[in-house]
């Protein structure tokens, strides 16, 4: 299985710069996209061999996620299963017999951390959502998590030092594996 994830920061502009060619060249089973910045009906994206599944933000020109998939899923879910966070087009989940494929665009805390309370609330809801999926079958999560796990992941760590420790704690807790295998993240996150 091959999956690609890309924050396009506006799919319409990206289409004019060879998006379809990239999909064809890479030929993934799943192409997960964040920040589509589209509303329903604004774009007819037809790529041979793929079906698209979208979660649109209510706010025009904002957020949005999409998965292009070669095989049809058993089910499709939009959002993270909670009303407070269901209006920004942040998550598409496709269910298959052996796994869930999830694309996610996490909210940014923004300058001055003015959206930090919303971000923390989103993270808690996301943790519950992913744990619920993981209790049923494995989860493959692709996306832009808007998080730096350690200081080395930041271009300018000085002013962001406190945020790194906050996000490091969240990502370690959220992504610690519930099942251990050769591909577990436990050694990466500890």
Name every feature range the model reports, one short phrase each.
Residues 1-47, 57, 62, 78:
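N-terminal, active-site-proximal structural segment of metallo-dependent hydrolase catalytic domains
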Residues 1-9, 98-110, 142:
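Active-site-proximal beta-strand elements of phosphoester/diester hydrolases
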Residues 7, 23-41, 101, 130-151, ...:
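Active-site beta-strand/loop signature of hydrolases that rely on acidic residues for catalysis
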Residues 11-15, 86, 118-125, 166:
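Soluble or luminal CAZymes and related metallo-dependent hydrolases
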Residues 37, 42-109:
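Structured beta-strand-rich core segments of catalytic domains in phosphoester-bond hydrolases
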Residues 51, 122-190:
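Metal-dependent phosphoesterases centered on the DNase I-like endonuclease/exonuclease/phosphatase
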Residues 81-82, 106-123, 156-163:
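Surface-exposed cleft-lining segments at the edges of enzyme active sites
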């Amino acid at each position: 299985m091959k999956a690609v994830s890309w924050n396009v920061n506006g799919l319409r502009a990206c289409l004019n710069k060879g998006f379809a060619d990239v999909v064809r060249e890479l030929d993934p089973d799943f192409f997960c996209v964040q920040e589509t910045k589209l509303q329903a009906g604004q774009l007819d994206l037809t790529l041979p061999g793929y079906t698209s599944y979208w979660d649109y933000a209510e706010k025009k020109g904002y957020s949005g996620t999409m998965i292009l998939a070669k095989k049809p899923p058993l089910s499709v879910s939009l959002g993270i299963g909670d009303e407070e966070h269901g209006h920004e087009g942040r998550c598409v989940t496709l269910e298959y017999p052996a796994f869930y494929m999830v694309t996610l665009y996490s909210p940014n805390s923004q300058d001055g951390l003015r959206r930090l309370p919303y971000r923390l609330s989103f993270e808690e809801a996301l943790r519950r959502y992913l744990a619920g999926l993981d209790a049923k079958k494995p989860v493959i999560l692709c996306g832009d998590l808007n998080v730096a796990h350690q200081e080395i992941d930041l271009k300018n760590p000085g002013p962001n030092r406190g945020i790194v420790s906050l996000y490091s704690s969240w990502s370690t807790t959220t992504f610690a594996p519930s099942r251990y295998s050769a591909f577990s993240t436990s050694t990466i996150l500890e």
